[in-house]
Amino acid sequence: KENINFFDFIKIDIQGAELDVFRGGAESLKNVLTIITEVEFVQLYNDQPLFGDMSSFLSKFHIMFHKFLSLQGRTLKPTILNNDLNHSSQHMWSDAMYIRDVEKISSLNNHQILKLSVLGYLYGSPDLTFHCLKFYDKKNNTQLTSILKN
């Protein structure tokens, strides 16, 4: 057994069983900063939890939905446009980015604030990065936000 106290970042895609993993590893969610997980909007597998189920569960750990990274879908059967089954008029799944609730940022230590800022930057969320750095600057009397203004 490994002695890992907490994770900063989780990326998971296991064909509809993501919520089962989070339920089984709920203790690991108490300190996670960012989660990238596949979510579905329509059931692709039997008894599969959907986006709302995932968001509701994660919110219990002060983890909020931030954005979709890649909406994916299929054409509605039996309509097939231009012989293309992948014509995605019906959004069916996406990778979703969840983050530590920004309203609770004061509960994070300095390292966590900076890590969340970097994760926001890496996943194309400059507003999240700026928010974290602005809070960090105020807390530590620094000027890290100035690097984003140039």
Name each model-derived stretch.
Residues N5-C132, Y136-D137:
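Conserved acidic-Pro-Pro-aromatic motif
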Residues K1-N3:
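Short amphipathic alpha-helix with an adjacent loop that forms part of the alpha/beta core around
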Residues N140-K149:
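Boundary/linker segments of alpha-helical solenoid repeat arrays
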